[in-house]
Amino acid sequence: MITKNYLIDKIHDKLNYLSKEDVKDSVDLILDYLNESLKQQKRIEIRNFGNFSIRKRKFPESEKFYNTVYYRMPKNLFKE
């Protein structure tokens, strides 16, 4: 499983000229922006990774709806 700390460590390994704190701040900033965009029901498209959007779903046996995150992966994600 990839956690936020794992992601920070891997980015820091590749970009060792940045401090770990700078990498952490950058990852936090990106995740916060993605989170806020989804809260505002904006569609997120990251080329060669996938699309994220909000979909409304209905509770079973109820007239109430809830929001869920929908992910669509690109067709070439697992192609070699």
From Swiss-Prot:
Transmembrane intervals: none
Disulphide bridges, residue numbers: none
Domain of life: Bacteria
Keyword DNA-binding: yes
GO MF annotation: an example: structural constituent of chromatin
Keywords annotated in UniProt: DNA condensation, DNA-binding
GO cellular component terms given for this protein: cytosol
UniProt xrefs under InterPro entries: Hist_DNA-bd, IHF-like_DNA-bd_dom_sf
Swiss-Prot/TrEMBL GO biological process terms: chromosome condensation
Entry keyword annotation includes DNA-binding: yes
Pfam families: Bac_DNA_binding (PF00216)
Record family assignment: Belongs to the bacterial histone-like protein family.
Role of this protein: Histone-like DNA-binding protein which is capable of wrapping DNA to stabilize it, and thus to prevent its denaturation under extreme environmental conditions.
Protein name, per record: DNA-binding protein HU-like
Lineage: Bacteria, Pseudomonadati, Pseudomonadota, Alphaproteobacteria, Rickettsiales
